[in-house]
């Protein structure tokens, strides 16, 4: 196994074990603003990931949702991009739709991606040129020929705000679940045709999933039609995203942007 991938998998498992110590237990919840909660579990997992990954690769840069950003990463060839607990709202609600997300970026490209759900024990993993796996079994993006049969994984908050209402009769099913990263893993495993978001996301939300999607034979683009180059000074990706099987992404892009 790729040594960097092995390191990322072990780190994600360690963080996941820590998170489970807090799951359905007492912990402190803070609000970072814009209804964006953070818990002591997020911080504990972040500290463990940084300790494990940066101790092993001190020359790499670091970008995490829960760490104060440093411009030092912008000069690094390789950067760890992590979200220690993607799906914090679901974690707080006791819903098992959250993951530890660990990616390694080299010259702007995600070359290692790991998503670990510590409740279900699902381990999505990929390294550039080596394929994508779910619990060591190969996975691949899949899609149906007809758009009106396709399953789209989307956001619970976007659904509540009515952003997907115009497309309710276009696709086969709009399935709203939590955690951007988890949705990318499920899509890479062929459990849905597409993951799509109509709102901006950050690099740490999607980086590991992007690697896994790529290695599962799919692609990820923003709603301007461009792939993401990672380790940017501004980490927000606007205006939204689509990922999945290549042909399904093209069809969905045309529908969501009104270019079909």
Where are these regions (language model features)?
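DPxDG-like acidic metal-binding loop motif
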Residues: 73-135
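Short loop/edge segments at beta-strand edges and connector loops
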Residues: 64-66, 136, 178
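Short loop segments at secondary-structure junctions
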Residues: 105-109, 119, 128-131, 137, ...
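An extended, acidic
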Residues: 142-260
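Short, solvent-exposed loop/turn motifs
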Residues: 110, 138-140, 227
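Residue-level signal for inorganic ion chemistry
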Residues: 19, 42, 53, 88, ...
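N-terminal subdomain of lithium-sensitive/metallo-dependent phosphomonoesterases centered on the IMPase/IPPase/PAP
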Residues: 1-85, 247, 257-258
């Amino acid at each position: 196994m790729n040594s960097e991938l092995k390191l990322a998998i072990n780190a994600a498992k360690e963080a996941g074990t820590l998170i489970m110590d807090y799951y359905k237990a007492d912990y402190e919840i803070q609000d970072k603003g814009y209804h964006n909660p953070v818990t002591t579990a997020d911080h504990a997992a972040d500290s463990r990931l940084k300790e494990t990954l940066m101790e092993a690769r001190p020359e790499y840069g670091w970008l995490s949702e829960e760490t104060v950003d440093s411009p030092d990463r912008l000069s690094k060839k390789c950067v760890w991009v992590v979200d220690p607990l993607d799906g914090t709202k679901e974690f707080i609600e006791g819903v098992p739709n959250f993951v530890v997300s660990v990616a390694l970026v080299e010259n702007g490209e995600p070359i290692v991606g790991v998503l670990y759900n510590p409740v279900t024990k699902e381990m999505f993993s990929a390294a550039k040129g080596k394929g994508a796996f779910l619990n060591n079994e190969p996975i691949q993006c899949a899609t149906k020929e007809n758009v009106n049969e396709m399953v789209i994984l989307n956001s619970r908050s976007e659904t509540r705000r009515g952003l997907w209402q115009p497309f309710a009769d276009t696709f086969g099913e709009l399935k709203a679940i939590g955690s951007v990263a988890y949705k990318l893993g499920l899509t890479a495993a062929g459990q849905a045709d597409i993951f799509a978001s109509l709102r901006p996301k950050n690099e740490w939300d999607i980086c590991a999933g992007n690697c896994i999607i790529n290695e599962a034979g799919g692609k990820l683009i923003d709603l301007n039609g461009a792939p993401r180059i990672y380790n940017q000074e501004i980490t927000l990706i606007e205006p939204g995203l689509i990922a999945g099987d290549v042909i399904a992404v093209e069809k969905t892009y045309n529908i969501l942007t009104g270019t079909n």
